[in-house]
Amino acid sequence: NPTLVGLSQLKELTMRIRRSKELSSKDIVDVYNNIYAGKFADDATDNYMQNWVISQNIKVGDRFIDFTAPDAKGEMHTLSKEIKGKIALIDLWASWCGPCRRESMSMKPLYESYKDKGFTIVGVARERRQEDMEAAIKKDGYPWLCLVELNDAGRIWDKYGVGNAGGAIFLVDEEGKILAIKPSAEEVKAILEKML
């Protein structure tokens, strides 16, 4: 019989999945779909699980997951509107994530070279305080649109399957299909040279 306690325990397993050798994400997806799906629709834990299940299916060739988030001035931006008709890099990062910031910095030359040829970058910072994002942008000099996800309000990281990470990069084509997940700058450059 499905209970909220059981659903909460299932959520806990999603947070430990990367370290588990006995349990796969497919196992958790199956348990959720077969036992809990639709049983606790108004509960925050169920909302988390729905997003987590969706995120487990993200792969190259899939359509990107749309979201809306504010910029530093509080103006709301919808990702699909910002990247429509362009090859786009969705850069999920955080001021406290050194590797994320190095990856973002490595994309600056590509942005400068291809921004007028149909390529764009939209960065989203995962922060507790907006000031942390603003300081990082000022220090690193990101020239592209930067949005902020405060306190995981929109669950963007969960939707993209990187809830336990500082960030990740997704390259999408003009139609919104994912071309690459966590590509290096060299891989992005090779794709851009072929497509633009």
For the regions a protein language model found, what residue spans apply to each?
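Conserved redox-active cysteine motifs that mediate thiol-disulfide chemistry
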Residues: L92-P109
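Oxidative protein folding and maturation machinery
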Residues: N1-T78
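Hydrophobic, well-ordered secondary-structure elements that form the walls
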Residues: I90, M133, G176
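Short, small/polar residue-rich loop motifs at catalytic or cofactor-binding pockets
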Residues: R63, K86, N164-G166
